[in-house]
Amino acid sequence: MTTLTLNTSLLSSRRILAAFSGGLDSTVLLHQLVLWRERHPDVTLRAIHIHHGLSPHAESWVRHCETVCARWQVPLVVERVTLADNGLGIEAHAREARYRAFAQTLLPGEVLATAQHLDDQCETFLLALKRGSGPAGLSAMGERSPFAGTLLLRPLLRETRKTLEQWAVRHGLCWIEDESNQDDAYDRNFLRLRALPLLQQRWPHFPAAVARSATLCAEQERLLDELLASDLTDCITTEGTLRLSPLMSMSDVRRAAILRRWLAMRNAPMPSRDALERIWQEVALARDDASPCLRFGDHEIRRYQSQLWWIKSVAGQHETTVAWPVWQTPLALPAGLGTVQLVPGGELRRPREEESVSIRFKAPGLLHIVGRHGGRKLKKIWQEQGIPPWRRDTTPLLFYGETLIAAAGVFVTREGAAEDKEGVSLVWHA
């Protein structure tokens, strides 16, 4: 193995963030990137280590990564993530948390490099095959993928695990061994420890053949993307929702392809065939007066105004009141709803000295809003403003004392309207 085995054609960016677990694969990747940096002094290289908290050795792994990065003069970011049960299983949840941390750490103009190799590609293909995936799932991993507004690069994807190990031994590299990698209760470990050695004993080039099949599946998906581009344009709204009316006249196969691509655009997990059928039958075709909802992990698919919505699940806050004693500073909202702040300049009056300020999520009685005659109940206002049902008890309502002043981004009440130029605006950062 030589330095040329790193697919440097991918490294057009000169700012690289390398995912570094401290294991064999990521150690070889980081070593090769360090050598690449030596030949290209304009390259800026950082590493990121994710502390999942799953192993009793996690702290020693952090120290190992710090030592390696210090020796190679690579700035290291250590991110500690908290894993909670979200119904996806520990492997999937750890991966989700890991990539969320990657996305949050990337700097402008920086690309992410990860250490997946040919054997990983084979495992990913077989896991997709086990799930009954179609060409999209069987495409496995690409060497270059869009990620968090930049790129995710896999410059070792053409190399085998054996080749990486030979490189590491030849160059005297040290790496950690995660004890969980020997637990064949995990599907990927079962393939790596039991199934693939047997297959390679019979067919030594099995991983390379699988990689070729994955490439062919990816090419078919790209062709379908081109052919369905105009359909997607017709179906997807500026808000990212999916119009149902164009789908009604499509064949089952074409409609399923559109649904899959829409979900991919929303960064949703690849749905199974059964899941697509449930989306169509239970959500899209639910009766007109229903508010159908189908859960997928910590997200939901809902229907509103003849459109499908992919949204994050948030518990209703109907009974919640959040005091805002220092209204001049931003206020954190519960349930991950973000923050609100009152900024100078706007159509809301400032609170009077004797008025307490709070955020609530319900308002009783008849409300009089700016631009409308007569009083209306809040439910009627939500309907008139086209606010989906699931946003109605999660949209912040600003109160001064017991007086409703405004709904963030939706309306201002007459009692809350500014009478002079010294008004404020309610800004919601969801």
UniProtKB/Swiss-Prot annotation:
Keyword Ligase: yes
GO MF annotation, one: ATP binding
GO biological process: tRNA modification
Superkingdom of the organism of origin: Bacteria
Keyword annotations: ATP-binding, Cytoplasm, Ligase, Nucleotide-binding, tRNA processing
Residues the entry annotates as binding ATP: 21-26
Record EC number: 6.3.4.19
Signal sequence annotation: none
Domain remark from Swiss-Prot or TrEMBL: The N-terminal region contains the highly conserved SGGXDS motif, predicted to be a P-loop motif involved in ATP binding.
Biological role: Ligates lysine onto the cytidine present at position 34 of the AUA codon-specific tRNA(Ile) that contains the anticodon CAU, in an ATP-dependent manner. Cytidine is converted to lysidine, thus changing the amino acid specificity of the tRNA from methionine to isoleucine.
Protein name, as recorded: tRNA(Ile)-lysidine synthase
Organism from which the protein derives: Salmonella dublin (strain CT_02021853)
